[in-house]
């Protein structure tokens, strides 16, 4: 098994927001995090949001300090992600993430009764 | 996401089972003025925190908000109309008792529900809430036009996607028509108050907690807008509900 570094940027938080302020990191360098685990708490002009981890991996770098304003698209976290040695890699620069099992849906979907 | 008819309005809500099925009392989350379940609670990481603690989460969009109907008549927003919706929802789901977690206006409604139906409420956690008048000095015939703290809140939320400024104005007037009173306090329902140290809308929360035999947890450095996603808040609530 090998590790690849992958950097996650501040996602578009919607409603035309262009930046967010880091309130509190929920992880530290060296932590192993699960996919969807709380990663960082940020505040926009509209609301406070917890961004979940997009991947399972080990935190290598946090690219912003707490109270720092980060533009959408700027680096937020670099993860070391484990890749299996027999994964197809030829011809691919970087890495195509392996799709993990879909998380169990917690929302019951039922059409409105009206 | 489901919707049901609770009285005169259709209410949208989510019903999220915990990650580990448990028979704990479900938690009813009540969002603040001008937001909705998704924005106030989901985006702030609450379903994950509560679900991870083995708790089932019920999350309505309160009338006038989110995916629920938005009447324009201020009488539709008296606190008792909201509590009737919530009791209707519990009946619909055949849930006898819940724990309540509110934020801001949702906390005021949690207090109201605990007063109205103490047999349906086990415990209540009230975030971002104190005995101060949230509408102080605001001209509610034209909310957003002035410069009071409420006018500023109104301007922010009335511009959010999916919100109806006219319905929110009616909601503000309906809420203001029944000023909060600390007396009587709910009987037999343990209360937890949680607020940011810099939250001016929660001024007096500590005294209110002391008056009604509750506890108060302060979140260092946070204000009304950014206390809701705090780990300190979530941990205090999980400890209060599960501990």
Task: Specify the residue positions occupied by each region the protein language model found.
Chain B
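N-terminal cap/lid segment of alpha/beta-hydrolase-fold proteins
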Residues: 1-11
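Active-site nucleophile elbow and catalytic-triad environment of alpha/beta-hydrolase enzymes
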Residues: 166-183, 198-200
């Amino acid at each position: 098994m090998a590790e690849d570094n992958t950097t996650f940027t501040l996602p578009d938080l919607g409603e035309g927001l262009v930046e967010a302020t880091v309130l509190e990191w929920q992880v530290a360098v060296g932590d192993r995090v699960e996919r969807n685990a709380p990663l960082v708490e940020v505040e926009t002009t509209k609301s406070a949001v917890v961004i979940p981890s997009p991947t399972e991996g080990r935190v290598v770098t946090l690219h912003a300090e707490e109270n720092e304003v980060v533009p959408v698209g700027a680096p937020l976290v670099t993860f070391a992600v484990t890749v299996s040695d027999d994964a197809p890699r030829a011809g691919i620069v970087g890495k195509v993430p392996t799709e993990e099992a879909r998380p169990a849906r917690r929302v019951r979907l039922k059409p409105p009764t009206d | 996401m489901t919707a049901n008819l609770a009285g005169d309005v259709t209410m949208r809500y989510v019903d999220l089972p915990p990650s580990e099925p448990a028979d704990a009392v479900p938690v009813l989350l009540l969002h603040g003025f001008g937001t909705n379940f998704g924005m106030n609670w989901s985006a702030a990481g609450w379903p994950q925190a509560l679900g991870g603690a083995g708790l089932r989460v019920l999350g309505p969009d309160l009338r006038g908000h989110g995916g629920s109907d938005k009447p324009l008549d201020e009488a539709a927003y008296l606190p008792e109309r909201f509590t009737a919706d919530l009791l209707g929802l519990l009946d619909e789901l055949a849930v006898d008792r819940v724990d309540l977690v509110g934020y801001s206006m949702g906390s005021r409604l949690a207090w109201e529900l605990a007063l109205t139906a103490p047999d349906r409420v086990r415990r209540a956690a009230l975030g971002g809430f104190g005995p101060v008048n949230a509408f102080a000095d605001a001209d509610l015939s034209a909310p957003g036009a002035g410069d009071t703290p409420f006018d500023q809140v109104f301007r922010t939320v009335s511009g959010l996607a999916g919100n109806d400024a006219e319905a929110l104005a009616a909601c503000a007037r309906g809420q203001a028509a029944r000023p909060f009173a600390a007396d009587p306090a709910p009987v037999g329902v343990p209360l937890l108050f949680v607020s940011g140290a810099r939250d001016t809308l929660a001024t007096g929360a500590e005294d209110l907690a002391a008056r009604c035999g509750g506890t108060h947890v302060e979140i260092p450095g946070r204000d009304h807008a950014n206390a809701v996603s705090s780990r300190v808040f979530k941990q205090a609530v999980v400890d209060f509900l599960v501990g």
